[in-house]
Amino acid sequence: MLRLLRPLLLLLLLPPPGSPEPPGLTQLSPGAPPQAPDLLYADGLRAYAAGAWAPAVALLREALRSQAALGRVRLDCGASCAADPGAALPAVLLGAPEPDSGPGPTQGSWERQLLRAALRRADCLTQCAARRLGPGGAARLRVGSALRDAFRRREPYNYLQRAYYQLKKLDLAAAAAHTFFVANPMHLQMREDMAKYRRMSGVRPQSFRDLETPPHWAAYDTGLELLGRQEAGLALPRLEEALQGSLAQMESCRADCEGPEEQQGAEEEEDGAASQGGLYEAIAGHWIQVLQCRQRCVGETATRPGRSFPVPDFLPNQLRRLHEAHAQVGNLSQAIENVLSVLLFYPEDEAAKRALNQYQAQLGEPRPGLGPREDIQRFILRSLGEKRQLYYAMEHLGTSFKDPDPWTPAALIPEALREKLREDQEKRPWDHEPVKPKPLTYWKDVLLLEGVTLTQDSRQLNGSERAVLDGLLTPAECGVLLQLAKDAAGAGARSGYRGRRSPHTPHERFEGLTVLKAAQLARAGTVGSQGAKLLLEVSERVRTLTQAYFSPERPLHLSFTHLVCRSAIEGEQEQRMDLSHPVHADNCVLDPDTGECWREPPAYTYRDYSGLLYLNDDFQGGDLFFTEPNALTVTARVRPRCGRLVAFSSGVENPHGVWAVTRGRRCALALWHTWAPEHREQEWIEAKELLQESQEEEEEEEEEMPSKDPSPEPPSRRHQRVQDKTGRAPRVREEL
């Protein structure tokens, strides 16, 4: 009965129609004990599927609130019980395991201490959970791994944005969509939804806010922004807040590590930490899992939502910014505390040592009690103690441990393990540096395609991972592809494909054609099949060469192929000062002011290599150019011509743009490649299958007798059959 009434009860908690919605997803029933998140989430999805948007919002929000409340209970109970003297672990167990001293009173003593402390800690945690969650609440509200993963991926917000949209709450719909997208930047449907929200009149730029941003990231970004404006005094409170928030976030993560053993991931079971044998093996196995999880909290705290990798040296770098900012405003004592804390991580850091000497000289007489920060000292001592135990288990029990910290002293690692760890690191060279291309003299002799020559390498292009190759297309092949682009543009009114003004400049017209669209037009008889087939063949030709040159030991996959033409608009070229395509990088958002490139949306972060295969040169302007990360200093310039390929890595090392096309029409095949097979271009596969089907049908028709029907099927009907066969109407994907 209670489960049937839950949607109605939660519906009453929603604000009345027309009332202002509070910013963010605030608590629906403050002070109330959390309910079972899994039941709330399941009920919310049922309401969503039934189109009951208001109950769906209430249930999904309450599921989020309850999940967060459970996390706070674990954190609070863990902290209070850890502070209980009667439940403290024996001091002898907090450091490295000592060699067995043999049977006797000493061994029995620590065993009794351990078990007594474990029992008291368990009793304390049970009583605390009962007070906060009710009797048996910890077991009743336990969440399975599948649901934890769904909440970590922020899936409730995917449903919330749709429900809010149906309720006409566009501000919250955009916020929920943005919150989901931040953690799932590769979600193509949400990328399209975000673009739609941006075009809606009722949505403001402020609507796109992350409702789940960890507080330490918000403070960190604000502090960096203020430092960039030379406002150290205003930045200091935000930087300190970021550091304290980072430490608090790690404590929350560590509390989650102490859940039931079944909640630990399968990763630990594979590395030998799973429970085997008797009592002590079981205790050791679970304890190792907890320690491994705690050590991973450093990387999780340093990883932005939606990012794959943590910010390197996150805590030490925060301390570096703090001591520099304190010094700028004259807080020398605090500057010394923070620089001494940096030296706890890196005792031989020359820059930190120079800064310390400078601060001490400016301060004058040494002040008693001035040392590293106590919170950082506690963090390092605890982390080193855990590492010591994990390396011991690695050496003696055969478990594995991936140390997340570059500052771990080498002396802490057992000598027997150092060589093995060094070998493991050397087995994966691409994790540390890109594959180096072969020298120019090698490529002049062994290029894969006859007639292809390497014209310029990275050295001649004044950069890294760049190359210009000529001869990939014959003049006849360039003509076929140019005709394909022209025919597709001419068929725009019938197919939904039409040119438009360039999104980068009002002085040019932009036309784009994907491989799938070309295949569909060829199947419909709108364009010739020769051009569509050549488009597929040439894209694979470019992929093969790019992989052979830049990544011979790691397969590359096409992620997107686009035939693009830019045409100068007559009468709009006088005194033109803009570019055809502004300077950018292909897999990160370039910040010319700082020279940094953020690998995050809206950039296509999975792109690893880019290629531009030119089809003509009978136009004015339109040269490709590379720059420094400041987007101002030009380092190389490439003039398009038929069959010329410019290939380069897609990151910050290769910012590039296109000079204005001031006369004529410039056409090129743009291709992007990825190491990630899950991001390979599915439309390329569909296009290939579609063209193969067309060829088979043509061959069958040739074998049959000529039909007496004087009225063959019109192209529009044939086009409709293509749509039906693929299961959906063909769509044009625009990508610049």
Curated annotation (Swiss-Prot):
Enzyme class: oxidoreductase
Binding annotation for Fe cation: 584, 586, 656
Region (Disordered): 253-275, 689-736
InterPro entries: Leprecan_dom, Oxoglu/Fe-dep_dioxygenase_dom, P3H, Pro_4_hyd_alph, Pro_4_hyd_alph_FE2OG_OXY, TPR-like_helical_dom_sf
Reactions listed under catalytic activity: L-prolyl-[collagen] + 2-oxoglutarate + O2 = trans-3-hydroxy-L-prolyl-[collagen] + succinate + CO2
UniProt cofactor(s): Fe cation; L-ascorbate
Active-site residues annotated for this sequence: 666
Keywords annotated in UniProt: Coiled coil, Dioxygenase, Endoplasmic reticulum, Glycoprotein, Iron, Metal-binding, Oxidoreductase, Repeat, Signal, TPR repeat, Vitamin C
Pfam families in the record: 2OG-FeII_Oxy_3, TPR_leprecan
CC per GO annotation: catalytic complex; endoplasmic reticulum
GO molecular function, one term: iron ion binding
Domain Fe2OG dioxygenase positions: 561-675
Glycosites: 331, 462
PROSITE patterns, per database record: ER_TARGET (PS00014), FE2OG_OXY (PS51471)
Biased composition range(s): Basic and acidic residues: 721-736
EC numbers on record: 1.14.11.7
PANTHER family tied to this protein: LEPRECAN 1, PROLYL 3-HYDROXYLASE 3
Quaternary data: Identified in a complex with PLOD1 and P3H4.
Membership in a protein family: Belongs to the leprecan family.
Protein name: Prolyl 3-hydroxylase 3
